[in-house]
Design a protein with these regions (language model features):
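Charged, low-complexity
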Residues: 1-32, 76, 80-87, 91-93, ...
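Conserved Helicase C-terminal RecA-like lobe
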Residues: 1-2, 13, 28-31, 37-41, ...
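Conserved P-loop NTPase motor "coupling/switch" region that bridges the ATPase
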Residues: 61, 108, 125-212, 388-391
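SF2 helicase motor core recognition
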Residues: 96-100, 147-150, 306-312, 330-333, ...
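Walker B catalytic acidic pair
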Residues: 112-113
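A conserved SF2-helicase RecA2
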Residues: 371-434
Length: 434
C-alpha cells in the first residue's frame, strides 16, 4: 500500500467517536493511559497522538516499547504516513540489557501492552520508569491493565505520571490499599478509599469496552463440569491427602504450593509429569471435550504440552493446526484464520492466547487454564473481537470438587474486581438512557 501524504487532520478524520475522545483527552493531559478494550484501535489512536505532537513541533523522537508480537504491528501502521519522525523500538525482553548503561532520551515513549509492566519490581518496569522520567510525553496502552489485583495499576501509572500515585509503592498502599490473602501478601482496595482510587484511575486514563465501541454478536460462557473417576480420582485424592499438612502450614514454600497446584491440574487432565509422563486410564476430561466438540472451526487452549499431544492423538480425524512456543512459523495461524485447511486450532495458552486474530472460529474451548485473569481474558478475545459476525460460545472444562473448580472461582473474582475499577465506576457516572 502506498504511504499517504502526512496529514494529521486526515488521520483524525479516520478516527471514530471513541477514538477521537481518547485522542482529545491525551492531547489535554499530555501523558495518559489508554485502556481501550481489544479491537478499540489503541495503536491507531497512539499514532494520531504521535503525528499531532510532531506536526505541532512538540516532539521529534519516539520510543515504542512492547512485546515482540505488539511491536510487529507498529511499522505497518506508521508506513501509511510519510512522516520524518524518528522512531525506535524496544522489546520488553531486551530491557534488562539497559540496566548498566546511560539511558537515552526520547520526546515521547509509548508502552504498548503496559500490563507487562505491572510487576513494579521487574527490570522491565524499572527501566521504563527511568526512561519515562526523561520523556516529555508518555502513553501506556492496554486492554487488560488489571490481571490479578488493583496493585497492577501502580507500576503503569508510575511510568505515565509518578505524581498520580507517587513513585513509592509503600505510600501508595498506605493511601489506598488493605493487605489480604495468604499471609497478607496481597492487596485490595480500602473500601473507604474506593471511589477516590477509581476517580484517579479514570482522571488519567481513557477506558472503553468492546461492547460500547463495537457492534458484536452475543457471547456465552459455558462452564462444563465433569466427574473425575478411576485411577485419576485415586491419584488426585492421594496427592491432596499427602500434602494436606503442608497446605495448612503457614510456612509452606510458595514454589511447593505452585508445584502442587500444577500437579493436581495435570491429574484432572488425565496425566501427571514425573520421572516419566504417566497417562491415566480414566480420561474424563478428554471424554467431556469429545461430547461438546463442534464439527465447525474451533479453538482449543491448553496449559500443558502433554495436553496438546494427548488431544492431537485423540483428534486425529480432524484437521489440526498446533501452535506452541516450538512453532517456528509464527504466522501459520493465518492459515487457520484465512483458509479452510484446518478446523481445529490447538494452542498453548501462553503462546496462542495473545496477538492472534482467530475470529473465523466462533467456538473456543479452555481445556485448561491458570489463575491469570489476564491470560484467560486475552485468550478469550482471540475469537471475540472486531470482525466476529457469529454468536460466540466459550467452553470451560473443569473437574468438579477439584482445584480446577477453584481456579474458575478465582478468575470470576478477579474479573469482578477489574470490572469494578475499569467499568462500573465509570458507567455509573454516565448519563442514564431513558
Amino acid at each position: 500500500m502506498q504511504a499517504s501524504k502526512y496529514d494529521p487532520q486526515g488521520l483524525l478524520d479516520k478516527l471514530d467517536k471513541f477514538q477521537l475522545d481518547a485522542f482529545n483527552k491525551a492531547m489535554r493531559l499530555g501523558s495518559m493511559c489508554i485502556f481501550g478494550d481489544t479491537g478499540f484501535g489503541k495503536t491507531r489512536v497512539a499514532t494520531a497522538i504521535m503525528m499531532e505532537l510532531f506536526a505541532t513541533g512538540k516532539i521529534k523522537t519516539v520510543l515504542i516499547c512492547g512485546p515482540k508480537s505488539a511491536l510487529e504491528v507498529w511499522p505497518q501502521e506508521l508506513s501509511l504516513f510519510t512522516c520524518p519522525i524518528r522512531v525506535t523500538y524496544l522489546n520488553y525482553e531486551r530491557a534488562p540489557s539497559l540496566v548498566d548503561i546511560k539511558l537515552p532520551s526520547y520526546d515521547l515513549i509509548i508502552a504498548d501492552e503496559s500490563h507487562r509492566l505491572k510487576n513494579r519490581n521487574s527490570v522491565q518496569s524499572k527501566i521504563l520508569w527511568r526512561l519515562g522520567r526523561k520523556a516529555k510525553y508518555r502513553l501506556a496502552l492496554s486492554g487488560t491493565p488489571q490481571g490479578n489485583s488493583v496493585e497492577d495499576y501502580f507500576a503503569q501509572f508510575r511510568f505515565v505520571d509518578p505524581e498520580v500515585f507517587g513513585g513509592n509503592f509503600k505510600e501508595f498502599a498506605t493511601a489506598f490499599m488493605l493487605p489480604c490473602g495468604w499471609m497478607n501478601k496481597k492487596w485490595e482496595i480500602n473500601p473507604d478509599k474506593e471511589d477516590l482510587f477509581n476517580s484517579i484511575i479514570h482522571e488519567y486514563s481513557y477506558r472503553i469496552t468492546k461492547e460500547e465501541a463495537l457492534t458484536l454478536p452475543p457471547i456465552t460462557i459455558h462452564r462444563v463440569p465433569f466427574e473425575l473417576h478411576g485411577d485419576a480420582r485415586e491419584a488426585y485424592e492421594k496427592m491432596v491427602e499427602e500434602h494436606l499438612l503442608e497446605i495448612n502450614d503457614t510456612e509452606i514454600d510458595a514454589t511447593l504450593a505452585i508445584t502442587l497446584v500444577g500437579k493436581l491440574q495435570q491429574i484432572c487432565s488425565g496425566f501427571i509429569y514425573g520421572e516419566e509422563l504417566n497417562i491415566f486410564e480414566s480420561l474424563d476430561k478428554v471424554a467431556t471435550l469429545l461430547k461438546i466438540l463442534p464439527t465447525e472451526k474451533v479453538v482449543i487452549f491448553c496449559k500443558y504440552e502433554a495436553e496438546i499431544q494427548l488431544l492431537r492423538a485423540v483428534l486425529k480425524n480432524r484437521f489440526i493446526l498446533i501452535y506452541t512456543g516450538e512453532t517456528k512459523n509464527k504466522e501459520i495461524w493465518k492459515e487457520f484464520q484465512n483458509t479452510d485447511k484446518y478446523d481445529v486450532f490447538l494452542a498453548n495458552l501462553k503462546t496462542g492466547g495473545t496477538g492472534l486474530n482467530l475470529q473465523s472460529a466462533c467456538k473456543l474451548i479452555f481445556f485448561s487454564t491458570g489463575y491469570s485473569y489476564l491470560d484467560f481474558y486475552q485468550a478469550r478475545d482471540r475469537v471475540y473481537r472486531r470482525g466476529q459476525t457469529k454468536p460466540v460460545d466459550i467452553y470451560c472444562l473443569y473437574a468438579k470438587g477439584t482445584i480446577e473448580e477453584s481456579i474458575y472461582e478465582v478468575l470470576d473474582e478477579k474479573g469482578k474486581s477489574a470490572k469494578q475499577v475499569l467499568d462500573d465506576y465509570r458507567l455509573k457516572l454516565l448519563p442514564q438512557k431513558k
